[in-house]
């Protein structure tokens, strides 16, 4: 089974972002805890340790992937329960990610964004990766099982390649 991609590439002042939205039939505070509490994060993506706070660094490990190594994450901003702004470092590479939450009538919307470098050859795999992890987050809230990674990758790569092309970061193949 292939899971359709739902995200998009949006140009910004410094390049472009992967943007993916998810909705939850849950209060904003509950969804917020799922993205900041190490134990609850571990259910869908990974866990972190350290002294968290704006301007501080924590160690984050993705637990849904075999052999994942801890990476350093700088917390640029945290406005609970509405916004988390972090930067993840792997060697000389870094990714800025933002999670914005809003609630209306008991429905919480999460908007995830991650910067994507024009020259990054792996950019078309980041979209499927975040679609996968954000769907895992939704599944933890709904009490449903997780789809397989194979339902996202490589099936979604053409969609994300086209998004990158439309944003002016890729030539037509």
Question: Can you annotate each of these PLM segments?
Answer:
Residues 1-11, 107-173:
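Terminal "cap-and-tail" regions of soluble proteins that handle hydrophobic small molecules
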Residues 1-48, 173:
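Hydrophobic ligand-binding cavity/cleft-lining segments
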Residues 3-4, 70, 74, 104-105:
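Charge-dense, helix-prone N-terminal extensions
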Residues 17-20, 26, 38-74, 79-83, ...:
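Short beta-edge strand/loop motif at the mouth of beta-sheet-based domains
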Residues 19, 68-72, 93-98, 125:
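Short, surface-exposed coil-to-beta transition loops
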Residues 28-29, 76-81, 101-109:
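A short, structured loop/turn motif at beta-sheet edges
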Residues 31, 41, 58, 75, ...:
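Hydrophobic pocket/interface hotspot
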Residues 62, 88, 112-114:
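Residue-level recognition of conserved beta-strand positions in structured domain cores
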